[in-house]
Design a protein with these regions (language model features):
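Active-site mouth of glycoside hydrolases
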Residues: 1-263, 274-287, 291-313
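Short acidic/histidine-rich active-site segments
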Residues: 267-269
């Protein structure tokens, strides 16, 4: 619901934060989103680097260079991003950390702490209170920020639709999944202590096995998680690729969201490989997109965001 009315959307993942050209073309990006009737943008409000990061990284990529140094210029640019989104009438989902090493992510948090950053080492991010404290500091800094351009606190800004704790969280062991459940509960509750205006999403990748599905349900059933979110890339280990498999995937997630968790369903990322040109497995790629959206909204899905939208490339 938005303003007392049902809110459903087609949106896009966009990257106005990481890179010189991407930052320079922020206004163009939101103009294009508006023209293409894409009403929600998912943006990564993250970027972690080493204290000896290059000047270019500091100027165009990072939110932090080491655990002690916050890059104010990046926060100023995030102010600009939200202003341009507001002008374009686009709502924003801000993702606050990354499971992967792109722009730092969980591996960089672990390196800051002198911990193993690969494979099973990721469990430490959810287990180590020092990692919790570093992430909470970033969350508090973003959610409580007052825009230099609008003088609106982010926690009060209606341009923001939701906070997403992580991009594509994955964990391989039962102990790690239990630790992540506690972490999601802690961080979602932390945001809700000073922001009662916005939705909070967990940011899990999804599931392909029964054990992962049970954990997915447990995380999304937490009181302070407001909607179910899953990513959809059938070619990446989520089953054999066919239109029927696409329908089965969407029907399963819709049933889980509506009948078990009883929360709205958002497909936070979806896409189909482009290495076969305009066709994918014998069908036009446009047909795959159309069928995904048709089935998702037929199932009363709340929204879906394509990966990735680059109108000027």
């Amino acid at each position: 619901m938005l303003g007392g009315q049902p809110f459903r959307f087609v949106g896009a993942n966009v990257n106005p934060m990481h890179g010189e050209e991407d930052r320079r073309r922020t206004e163009d990006l939101f103009t294009a989103l508006r023209q293409d009737n894409l009403s929600v943008a998912r943006i990564w409000a993250l970027g972690e680097g080493q204290p000896d990061a290059t000047e270019w990284q500091i100027k165009y990529v990072l939110f932090q260079a080491g655990p002690e140094r916050v890059i104010e210029e990046t926060l100023l640019h995030l102010d600009r991003v939200l202003l341009e989104a507001r002008r374009a009438g686009v709502r924003v989902i801000l993702t606050l950390s990354n499971n992967w090493a792109d722009y730092g992510g969980v591996p960089m948090y672990l390196r800051w702490l002198g911990l193993p950053a690969d494979g099973m080492g990721k469990e430490a991010f959810y287990l180590d209170e020092r990692a919790h404290a570093l992430f909470r500091a970033h969350v508090g800094r973003i959610v409580n920020r007052v825009s230099s351009l609008t003088n609106i606190r982010y926690s009060d800004d209606p341009t923001i639709l939701a906070w997403e704790l992580m991009n594509e969280s994955t964990i391989d062991t039962p102990a790690g999944r239990q630790a992540r459940l506690y972490w999601v509960r802690e961080m979602a509750r932390y945001i809700k202590t000073f922001d009662h205006n916005h939705l909070v999403a967990a940011g899990l990748w999804g599931y392909s096995m029964r054990s992962e599905r049970a954990d997915f349900i447990a995380v999304h059933s937490l009181r302070d998680i407001d909607y179910v979110d899953s990513h959809l890339y059938l070619q990446n280990g989520q089953g054999n690729v066919s239109l029927q498999r696409l329908y089965d995937f969407l029907d399963d997630r819709a049933y889980l969201a509506e009948q078990i968790v009883r929360k709205p369903l958002v497909i936070g990322e979806f896409g189909f490989r482009t290495d076969q040109g305009p066709r994918y497995l014998g069908l036009p790629r446009s047909r795959w997109f159309a069928e995904l959206l048709r089935r998702h909204f037929q199932n009363q899905g709340a929204g879906a965001l394509v990966w990735i939208y680059e109108p000027y490339h």
